[in-house]
Amino acid sequence: MMSTSSDAQLDPVEFIHSRIRTVPNWPQPGVMFRDITPLLQSAKAMRVLVDLFVERYVDAKLDYIAGLDARGFIIAPIVAYELSVGFVPIRKVGKLPYKTQRESYALEYGTATVEIHEDACKPGDRVVIVDDLIATGGTMMAGKNLLDRLGAVVVEGAAIVDLPDLGGSALLRGAGLSLYTVTEFAGH
């Protein structure tokens, strides 16, 4: 991580990139975990990050920002608040109390399922999906599929970090989802 004395010399994207810590061999050997907690611990970095998202979507005529469980919940509601739009949680299965739609997706070992309240948005609502990171793209694709099923217009998927070598961003773009990511890291 760079020292704060050099922060003024960095552009916003470089500044955000410099606040993401790489943790080797976590949660398992061979994985280079991209840890956003140092970014979250800095009020300045949070402001820069939120401003990047807000500037991107201020004129997009959105109805909602959807956040993916769990780290998407950190940034998405803040961006929704700043844009004066609603927030839609897309949760891990079994966490929402009302009637839901579910979508399962493949993980490296097994499957996972996310769900959304069936009345979370209505046909034609314009939504951006936000998460912390795009790796394999499975969670964001599941979120897109859920929103599509509700009739929403998924304007874009957005994340702080893209890990393009894992193929998720290519998969999502190949499925017709426009993407915005603040920064990217090579490798896993």
UniProtKB/Swiss-Prot annotation:
Pathway: Purine metabolism; AMP biosynthesis via salvage pathway; AMP from adenine: step 1/1. GO terms for biological process: adenine salvage; AMP salvage; purine ribonucleoside salvage. GO terms for cellular component: cytoplasm. It catalyses: AMP + diphosphate = 5-phospho-alpha-D-ribose 1-diphosphate + adenine. Its EC number is 2.4.2.7. GO terms for molecular function: adenine binding; adenine phosphoribosyltransferase activity; AMP binding. Keywords: Cytoplasm, Glycosyltransferase, Purine salvage, Transferase. Belongs to the purine/pyrimidine phosphoribosyltransferase family. HAMAP family: Aden_phosphoribosyltr. Homodimer. This is Adenine phosphoribosyltransferase. It comes from Burkholderia thailandensis (strain ATCC 700388 / DSM 13276 / CCUG 48851 / CIP 106301 / E264). The gene is apt.
